Regions:
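PLP-dependent amino-acid enzyme catalytic core
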Residues: 1-334
Length: 334
């Protein structure tokens, strides 16, 4: 009997699910990261950052952790803080999904809401959040783990996610994921390319994000991406990326709804992005005699998006429902 003794042991070693498509020359694998205890791949981030801070002596029992997050990192830190005896405050803003905020509270975490007017230095709200997290940590003798620039973040994905993917799909040809702090793809991508330089790494961001384009605009996708005008994280390593591209709110959200209703997979917005893009990418590729193996990082569960992407009224109000996208998905994912 495989009995675990603490929450830490539940992080990682997530399953891979193969799903069929109309293209018999492709094998499509989903790395289901929502099997982590707090429900996303950011459990790996929290685990790596907290372990490194404890080992260095920066984080000690009874201290409070302050972190800027749109939701999943904060959920993971709140969970591990509760398990390890730390206090935790998430620095959030008005754009954070209510479902994620409720989860943070459920783990005993506190919320500090930032506004555009809070910091006299101005700048984008993401930068305001990041500065607020550092300021609160300094004022209270707490700790800001800084998921954006802390090299332990991509290192954690290198040591775990990259290794697991290679063990589960040794002859992988493509890895597709979304990019926010850049840590998951930078870390796992490095690991894969060290073992097979021919593996292609594709990074996706929401249409409107500014990782690879200075011209950004607003979007509803809440996990990946980076708003125009915000200071980009240092953890993004573009040298391992073979391609970058964009997926719209409409494409991601309708894909989420399709997989919930027709495949029994309740996935989040970044997962909707990779599932839609995989279809688009494969359909544009010529038929091959070789079997191509593609792994998609399914970052989190759709349970954190019930109030918007899975809410009919919200989707209608934002004019995001699209029957053609659903039809295309049904024809590809058999």
């Amino acid at each position: 009997m495989n009995i675990k003794r603490n929450i830490d042991e539940l992080i990682g070693n997530t399953p891979i699910l193969e799903i069929p498509t109309v293209r018999t020359d492709w094998e499509l694998y989903l790395k289901l990261e929502y099997f982590n205890p707090a429900g996303s791949f950011k459990d790996r981030t929290a685990y790596a950052l907290m372990n490194a801070a404890e080992k260095s002596g920066k984080l000690k029992k009874g201290m409070e952790i302050f972190e800027s997050s749109s939701g999943n990192t904060a959920k993971a830190l709140a969970m591990l803080s509760a398990a390890r005896g730390y206090k935790f405050t998430a620095i959030v803003d008005k754009h954070a999904p209510a479902d994620k905020l409720n989860s943070i509270r459920a783990y005993g975490g506190k919320l500090h809401f930032c506004t555009d007017e809070e910091d006299p230095k101005g700048g984008h709200l993401v930068d305001v959040r990041r500065r607020a997290a550092k300021k609160l940590a300094e004022e209270t003798n707490g700790v800001n783990l800084d998921q954006y620039d802390n090299p332990e973040n991509p290192k954690g994905f290198y040591n775990t996610l990259g290794k697991e993917i290679l063990e589960q799909v040794p002859d992988i040809d493509y890895l597709i994921g979304t990019i926010g702090t850049g840590s998951s793809l930078s870390g796992s991508g490095h690991y894969l390319k060290e073992h097979n330089k021919d593996v292609k790494i594709i990074a996706l961001e929401p249409k409107g994000s500014s990782h690879f384009s200075p011209r950004g605009h607003g979007y509803f996708i809440s996990g990946p991406g980076y708003p125009a005008g915000a200071i980009l994280p240092k953890n993004i390593d573009t040298t391992i990326l073979d391609k970058n591209d964009y997926v719209s709110d409409k494409e991601a959200f309708n894909t989420m709804r399709f997989f919930g209703e027709h495949k029994g997979l309740l996935v989040g917005d970044s997962s909707g992005m990779v599932l839609y893009y995989a279809m688009k990418f494969i359909k544009e590729e010529p038929v091959s005699e070789k079997i191509n193996k593609m792994v998609l990082i399914i970052s989190d569960s759709g349970e954190s998006y019930l109030s918007h992407a899975f809410n009919d009224s919200w989707m209608i109000e934002k004019e995001l429902l699209d029957k053609q996208i659903t039809k295309d998905l049904a024809e590809f994912y058999i």
